[in-house]
Amino acid sequence: MFNKRIKKALVTGITGQDGAYLADFLIRKGYKVFGLYRRTSSPNMWRLLNLGIRDKIELIPGDMTDMASISNAIIKSKPDEIYNLAAQSFVGTSFEQPLVTAHVDGIGTVMFLEAIKQINREIRFYQASTSELYGNGKVDRSVNESYLDEHSLFWPVSPYAASKLYSFHLVRIYREAYKIFAVNGILFNHESPLRGLEFVTRKITNDLARIKLGLQKNMQLGNLAAKRDWGYAPEYVEAMWLMLQQPTPEDFVVATGEKHTVREFMELSCEILGLRSKEIFVQNKRFLRPLELNCLTGDASKAKKTLNWKPRVKFKELVEIMCKADLGRWQNHLKGKIFPWDAINDPSAY
């Protein structure tokens, strides 16, 4: 009998939340996984170590703004699939560093598409798009809070979203002009214990865990009225993979279809941890965005019908998972345990 050929995948942004979960998912599927990561003096591997997969991945140092670097990664890994998850993905930072954001989130995507066109057009390409594309879209709505799908109007309100919109259209153009199997995954917010501390959900659960243990007195946040459609990240990376297994390339929205406010996330977290939000919350204008989105709620009907994908972890369970993870980390830290983690900069943990 012939041995089944092992599929290979190249994942950019592999040290991030989505990259780590996707790598873990692909490894479980039997893939050989290559990861492109930034050339830095101390690459942050805590997520890969946390999942126990660091030694199962072949890492390739590279630069998302350098064509030669990207081409080299493709030639070296010879992938069947490429998942482009690398991004400057923090909206606030995109206002402070718009040029960096444009180069990484926009030009980097074009370089990958061009490299695929030149090296091997059989490679399947996934582009991590975002619900931020919709912004406060100027759509014809009977009410302000409508569900957004693949046909809704894009109206970005940040340099991050604008850069992602550029990438979105280039994926479509290369798909149509060069018949490359390239797709956009328009993912709404998705969280987990591996979310970065700069994101509000993880900031809430980490701060509240510290408050619960007497390590800090209050929690500072910005706009509590902001509404989002929050899902569970490990489920969303499965949707990414499913998109590249289809007979034809199409774009998909991935979302829960439920909206919740930052206040709801905060108050539920407090309830889970036995805290009172009124006693610990302090509003800080520093955490307000120059332009805030009103409400983003996704319609993933197409993904459900075509990919047979649907979210399983509900909002309350998601918050519980994150709260318990951060509380457990801080409890273990206080016991003197050393482990890969982002809240403590301890080189010995790596």
Give the residues covered by each predicted segment.
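The catalytic Tyr-centered alpha-helix of NAD(P)H-dependent dehydrogenases
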Residues: 152, 156-163, 193, 197-201, ...
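N-terminal Rossmann-like NAD(P)+-binding domain of SDR-like oxidoreductases, especially those catalyzing
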Residues: 1-190, 244, 313, 325-350
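Aromatic/pi-system hotspot detector in well-structured domains
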Residues: 101, 194, 259
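Activation segment
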Residues: 68, 135-137, 194, 264, ...
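C-terminal substrate-binding subdomain of Rossmann-fold SDR/epimerase-dehydratase oxidoreductases
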Residues: 22, 28-29, 35-36, 62, ...
